[in-house]
Amino acid sequence: KSEGTDMMKSISVKIRKGAMAYLKRQYKTVGIFFAIMFFILTVLAAKRFLSPFVPCAFLTGGFFSGLSGYVGMNIATYANTRTANGVRDGLNKGLKIAFASGSVMGLTVVGLGLFDISVWFILLKFVFKLSINDVMTAMLTFGMGASSMALFARVGGGIFTKAADVGADLVGKV
């Protein structure tokens, strides 16, 4: 679908650049948290309090959650002007574009999560022949990594959105 007028395309590029700059900064900050958590989990695994697979499961959970966020941000910024342009031809067309782009994001999150947890299950249960308790511990840690990344994205996204709202209010008043 078309991105619309030249003005819409220009605004879209600026939004996309700002969103990607935000995401890059956020992922650098979250990377520090993940490095610290990986170190802590590795120490616990070395002392045999945890399975040696737990630190890697935590990292892959965070990685796939972050990848979902990156894909979602790209889809959202590309669909933004296409949806606005579609609405010019009727609400139904704009709704279809928005629904399709939102569906892609939802399926990406579920697909990446299912892929990662399936790989972990197959590796741990059938390749390394671990007990089901050890497999479940690693899978729960995968979920902890994914949830940690999602939490940072949620909190950071709320702050980013509020800053954008304040900026829009200031522009509207000036």
Which residues does each PLM region occupy?
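Hydrophobic, small-residue-rich transmembrane alpha-helices and their short perimembrane loops
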Residues: K1-V174
